[in-house]
Amino acid sequence: MAEKRRGSPCSMLSLKAHAFSVEALIGAEKQQQLQKKRRKLGAEEAAGAVDDGGCSRGGGAGEKGSSEGDEGAALPPPAGATSGPARSGADLERGAAGGCEDGFQQGASPLASPGGSPKGSPARSLARPGTPLPSPQAPRVDLQGAELWKRFHEIGTEMIITKAGRRMFPAMRVKISGLDPHQQYYIAMDIVPVDNKRYRYVYHSSKWMVAGNADSPVPPRVYIHPDSPASGETWMRQVISFDKLKLTNNELDDQGHIILHSMHKYQPRVHVIRKDCGDDLSPIKPVPSGEGVKAFSFPETVFTTVTAYQNQQITRLKIDRNPFAKGFRDSGRNRMGLEALVESYAFWRPSLRTLTFEDIPGIPKQGNASSSTLLQGTGNGVPATHPHLLSGSSCSSPAFHLGPNTSQLCSLAPADYSACARSGLTLNRYSTSLAETYNRLTNQAGETFAPPRTPSYVGVSSSTSVNMSMGGTDGDTFSCPQTSLSMQISGMSPQLQYIMPSPSSNAFATNQTHQGSYNTFRLHSPCALYGYNFSTSPKLAASPEKIVSSQGSFLGSSPSGTMTDRQMLPPVEGVHLLSSGGQQSFFDSRTLGSLTLSSSQVSAHMV
């Protein structure tokens, strides 16, 4: 049916009549005009595409607008742009120019002409053949020390806050580019919450967990860099540091510190503010918003506020990397410890243990079964026995040994000495005054030594022992006519002689002159005497140096209050330590003074 109709003379006549109608004639003319306009705009767009892509987008928008305004077109225009009778070619050019201007504004180009008239197109085309003027760049901020921030962020950065304010570590340090060198800018920083949650640290999993909702908001604070305002050139040629910024949890703070809540997560922000837009900038007000304000933040700078570090890894990392935390580092890496310092001075410490009256009970009690007492009282209140002097473990070298001697010249009747397994190591007889002396030593402070009048030391050594004899006529203190004290020096095979033949030379002497006395140590090569140590209580003398004789004495002092000689005597054939003549006594009462004891610390060190 349709074919019949189409082939009918009526239908053919209607089509021919329509081709010569007024509407068809007007539409063809308009179509020709639009094609001319499109060719012209296409040429402009081709030239504008070299310099700015926004022009082509603007031209497309103008054509679209003109096609939308074309309502009376009889035939559909090809590829989308026909103009209606209500719009002229000038309007199309104006619309195209306006779209191109929008494109420049979007591209931040200063070359867009505000009028959008046809005369503006040649002006733009004249500017396009040359190099276009540089458009101002958008500000760019780069975080300095980003690697350190990332290390903290991987663990979970924590920042200490205190009432007085605490600086951040790592501190925010940035580098800014893209500013107008001649424009003035403010650089500021604020810290905003990441979310509205409160956190707690779970130690067994070493993670931060949500503990509830955030606390009430704190007063806003902004830290304005002290160098603000400054030109863009000044800001761009330096690293901008916010190391003086402090964090506090004191909501009543009036020092300008940033107020934060503990156990919350925060994000620092850096603001670049043009001076003309920073009139409302204040440390106690939020940062103003506007066209001249740019904010920058970095995800690795998120931190959790704490009053004490929760994660030990954060603590160690901050101690290692913070230059202000040197005091918390291991001192052994930087300086010698006290113990190492003391060890470098061997003479400060005794090389062997001190032999005291308290050590004597460690000597085993051997010998006759009838040996039950050491010292017998003399009726003056001294205890009859001192069993603690003879008991305990085996002998050690060096040590004092007690044993009987068949040639005793002075007995402590009826005391028996227990024999020691070692031969030649004997302490042959104290006089009965030894009990009094020992009792006097064990008494409280306030006791004084009663200096004997004529005791003397005579030491004669064998190949294995050094015998120090104490002789005299007075029995007050350490006095026996021919009592010998045998002490072994370990490994000392050569002879060691300490001779004081003069009867006037004494150990604890009054102000006596010693005439004709010959005092000497004789030490045969290759052995050497390291030193003796007679340990006394610090109360024995106000100054240990006073105990030492001014010339020729072999006694020294140590920091512990011990009278000791820690110097190695060279292995020479003869060493004169106590010279003849003068007042060279072993212990002189003029230097010793009134001696008081609180403990029985009279001992000897032998090496």
UniProtKB/Swiss-Prot annotation:
- SUPFAM superfamilies, alphabetically? p53-like transcription factors
Coiled coil ranges (UniProt) are none
What does UniProt give as GO cellular component? chromatin; nucleoplasm; nucleus; RNA polymerase II transcription repressor complex
The principal localisation class reads: nucleus
> Motif Nuclear localization signal: where?
36-40
Q: Per its UniProt entry, which superkingdom is the organism in?
A: Eukaryota
User: What biological process terms from GO does the record include?
Assistant: cell fate specification; cochlea morphogenesis; morphogenesis of embryonic epithelium; negative regulation of canonical Wnt signaling pathway; negative regulation of transcription by RNA polymerase II; neural plate anterior/posterior regionalization; positive regulation of DNA-templated transcription; regulation of SA node cell action potential
Comp. bias (Low complexity): 44-53
Q: Which residues bind DNA?
A: 143-330
**Residue ranges for motif Engrailed homology 1 repressor?**
18-28
KW Iron (keyword) present: no
Q: What is this protein called?
A: T-box transcription factor TBX18
* Annotated organism of origin: Homo sapiens
Taxonomic lineage of this organism? Eukaryota, Metazoa, Chordata, Craniata, Vertebrata
